[in-house]
Structures are given as C-alpha cells and as structure tokens.
Amino acid sequence: MINNKNLVSKYYEMWNSHDFSKAANIFSENLRFHGSLGTDTVGIDEFKEYADMILAAIPNLYHATEIVIEEGPQVAVYVTYSGTHKGKLYEYEATDNRISYSGASFLTIRNEKITDIKVLGDRYSLYNQIKAK
C-alpha cells in the first residue's frame, strides 16, 4: 500500500522525467485537472495532451517540491517551476528566457489513485518572464 505523499511524489517524478507512460499507475481513469494557465482536463489522455503542450513550450521544465502537507485524502504541495521558454505557450512565442515561478497544487487521492488536481501558479510572474524581449 502506497501512502498519499509517496503517490504525489511519483506524480512530480513523472513530470520531472517527462515520462507519462505510467500515468495510469497513479491517476484514476477519470482524473480531473484544473491548471492555473486556464486548462481543464478530464481523463488521463487529456492530461497527457496538456503535459505535452507545456513540455513543447518549456522542454526542460522542472518541478521543485518545497512543502508537502497531507490531510486525509488531500495533499497540498508548494512548488517552484523552472525551465527555459523554447516554444509557444498560449499566445506567447518562444523567447528563450529562463523562467522560475511558484505555485501550489492540491491533489485528492482515492483508492491509491490521484483523482483530482488543482494548480494555482503565479501566472503574473510567469507571463512577465515570457513576454517578448
């Protein structure tokens, strides 16, 4: 039996390795994801499409988990995101700028699977870093 913090750790390992091939091992098939960049997905395939879009824009994206708090089926994580803006991200063309911004994620776990993810990132900071020079 895996504990909730370890499951969330596997989620961030998946992001940092850029390998989502084992997503079904940690996500429920009806995963609901709400990202601070305005994206809502339902299901593993939609989440993978979102991840592919983000990684096309920031191919070396890294999630540094700084604080992890577990309360029952909920896990809250304070994260610093970093990488290089190499591709188009929404309306922002590639700038080759290094980015670093913080956020918080709130994950719900049921039956040893992540069922819901809500991300609140500092969009203002991110957008200021990826505006054209």
Per-segment meaning from a language model:
Residues 1-133:
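C-terminal and inter-domain tail/linker signature
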